[in-house]
Every structure is written in C-alpha cells, then in structure tokens.
C-alpha cells in the first residue's frame, strides 16, 4: 500500500478537458473572487467548446463589471468572443425576471398565465426563487449551449440554487395533482372577466413542460459526468470553514465537487523582504494552505495570486485565466 499519494494536478484543466460537463457551478463565501474565477473558467472553456454561457445568479451582478460590459436577463455575446455569452438573473425577482416574450402567444392565455402562475406558486412557501431558476433552466436548455457556468451568490443562495430542482419537482407535483380541481374554477373565473378565449389547459401544459425539463435537470445535476461544483476560497479561517460546510452540503445533495480554488495568495519575492505585514500574511496563509492540503488531498487545489491591479475587462480576464490551466509561477512572472 502506498502511504504518500501524488497530489492531483493543481489546475482546472480536468474540468476544461471533460467534454461531458454541461453545468459548472462556481461558489463560495462573499469577497473571495468567485466572479473573476468563474469568468476566467468560462474564457478557457470557450477555447475548446462550441458555445459557452456564463450566468450570474448573484444580485450584485459582478460579471458586468468583470467584463466591463452591461449584461441583462437575455444571453448576450461577450465582447471579443464569438462563442461566449453572458446573462444575469435575480432569483429574488421570481418569474418577473423572465423576458416578457416568454409569456407572449397568439391568444390571451399565455399572457394571463404568467400572473396566474405567479399567484399559484406564491401559495407554496420557498418555491418562488426555485421557480425563477426553473424557468431560466428551461430557457437555457432550449438554447443548446455546450456548457453553462454559474457565477453564484454567497453560500446560502448557492445551496438553494443547487436544491431548486427538488423543490420545484415537489411543488409542481402538488399543483399538477390539484389541476383537475383548479381548472374548472379558473375557467369560471376567466369567463366572469369576459375572457372566453382563454384556455386554462395552456397553464397546465406549461406546468407539465416545466416539470419534465426540471426532472431532467435534476437527474443531470446529480450526474458527475454532467455537473460539478468549483469551490472558491481564500487562505483564512472563516473562508476555509465556509468551504468545508459547502462541500458537506454539496455531498449531501449528491453534487460532484473535486476542485477548489484558493484565491488572492501572496507569493513572496525579494521586494517583500522588508515588509513585516507581508511576512506575517504569508505565514498565516501557509498555515491554512497546509490545512487545505490535509483536508482535500483528493481534490484539485488551484492556487491563484493576489494581484496589484484588479482583473477587469476581456483582455485582463484572458490573461488571468491562464493561471487556471498552468500553476502560477511568481519567478516566471517577475522575468516578464
């Protein structure tokens, strides 16, 4: 038996080269650089995939700042790329976040169904946020992107995002079981309002379609060949604690996770020799890097540097993204 296993490659190359992946989530504690990492990963994926979509589910919507380009709730091509698209959604907005075109149709039924659906799901606690994810997933799946990268909100929101397929399946299951009782009442109601051309079956069909898609997404989320999670942290106690909690929750949910990014690391060089704060900071981070190495010996642990300037704009992200594929070497950088 071998006591000392070789550490896994310290990069995200394993994810970029895994052609079967459809959904990649990037998350962690607030302020650790999730958006920079998710944007950089999307840039690397765009080199080898036919089409890539990065979705921000963080209400702060930092990917617009990262790429220095305004994004909306509709997939928009990122400047400087032919096959990289980005969109931003606010899960707290529920179904109101969706493009109005989604609910338009030839008759009044589709337009009415948005309001009716919103009222119905409001009666089910906790499902509104999940339904907004569900509708976005339905739209995204219809666009057939090769891979989708999620730039998620801080940990609590992330766990709800991961769990949304189960929540929606359960909630929609209840609605569909009640639809035979509800449909006649809705038909009478819309008739009283003088909307005789409204077909309540349209609403029922929408729920059926959504449940079918979400069931499929739920199966894909729990398939390590199609879905994985990348945890981003910094070498500090609270961030490491949050990362461990996140990994435990992901494991409970059946979500694959075998990549960790440790961001904002200080790499000492000759210019730091007289800096007491730098030396102290370096000592602290080495302590937590040792803990990470012990805790996650079966993970790919990628170490990224703390830079003098912020990473902003397509060119900066392209340059920074190379650190995801090849371990950062401060000596090589100092020679450039």
From Swiss-Prot:
GO molecular function, one term: ATP hydrolysis activity
Catalytic residues in the record: 58
Superkingdom of the organism of origin: Eukaryota
Binding site for ATP: 29-36, 236, 263
Protein location: Cytoplasm; Endoplasmic reticulum
Family annotation (Pfam families): ArsA_ATPase
Protein name per its UniProtKB record: ATPase ASNA1 homolog
Stated family: Belongs to the arsA ATPase family.
Major localization listed first in the record, in broad terms: cytoplasm
PANTHER family per record: ARSENICAL PUMP-DRIVING ATPASE ARSENITE-TRANSLOCATING ATPASE, ATPASE GET3
Free-text function comment from the UniProt entry: ATPase required for the post-translational delivery of tail-anchored (TA) proteins to the endoplasmic reticulum. Recognizes and selectively binds the transmembrane domain of TA proteins in the cytosol. This complex then targets to the endoplasmic reticulum by membrane-bound receptors, where the tail-anchored protein is released for insertion. This process is regulated by ATP binding and hydrolysis. ATP binding drives the homodimer towards the closed dimer state, facilitating recognition of newly synthesized TA membrane proteins. ATP hydrolysis is required for insertion.
